[in-house]
Amino acid sequence: QRQMCIRDRPVLWCADKMTAYERRSFNQQRIAYVIPGKQLNAPLLGLLASRAVQSPYVLREAFSPSAQAVLLWCLLKKKHDSVDSTMIGEATGYSRITVNRIMGEIGMLLPELVSVHKGIKFIRIHEAKAAWMKARKFLESPVKRRYDVQRTVNWPEGLLVAGESALAATTALAEPGKFSWAVFAERYKILLKDECWREMAYAEQATDVIEVWSYDPVLLSSGRSVDPLSLMLSMRREAEMDPRVEAAIEHVEEELKW
């Protein structure tokens, strides 16, 4: 930062960038300032100018985890309903800024699902199956990592069944040797700190498998297992290598009640 000062002349503060707090403070103290190429604020000189720059959404090839969670929530629980940002925020706990970004992502990749009425954006899914089929190419596995763990006496209640264990519960797929459970990434850290399990270096020493998810599986679940859409996405890679898993996923999709 540098200050231009000439005796008996107005002072103009020049800075490459300024925070919102600094700009507000300068405005309150009536200090003239300029951010080259962006803003000029010198009311005593009769000079006020700014360049309005709207940051475009980054072109994405896939939804962010939060946007994916909201889209799946709409597909599973809000079919044929108009959902605005307030409803999304209340259901998910996401901030207004995050919800606005999510609306932008969905509107960019699936514009037919987003409409505007009186300045308010809504998500409305008329044909859930068609929306799912079109959205799949933008959706990713929610699983960030899988851990082989050994239970302790502090094993928590209420974990959602996931992975092959969830597939086996609703299809002809045989149950795996270890149960799989889904946990939101933020909760995983807490449960690990509470010594609910121990991470094992060798799979044969483990009693269970913990899937760490990029969004909260509880948001979308309506039972003891993770939701069917996230389940299919989480097992995509396994389905490519194992025809039994592929057949089980196809069965889950066929049984969906759109």
List where the protein language model places each region.
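Short, small-residue-biased leader/transition segments that mark boundaries at the very start
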Residues: 2-6
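Nucleic-acid nuclease catalytic cores
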Residues: 9-30
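Charged, structured surface patches that assemble and position nucleic-acid processing machinery
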Residues: 30-42
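Intrinsically disordered, low-complexity basic tails/linkers immediately adjacent to helix-turn-helix/homeobox/MYB/SANT
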Residues: 60-63, 118-144
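Loop-centered beta-sheet repeat module
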Residues: 67-131
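Hydrophobic alpha-helical interaction segments
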Residues: 196-258
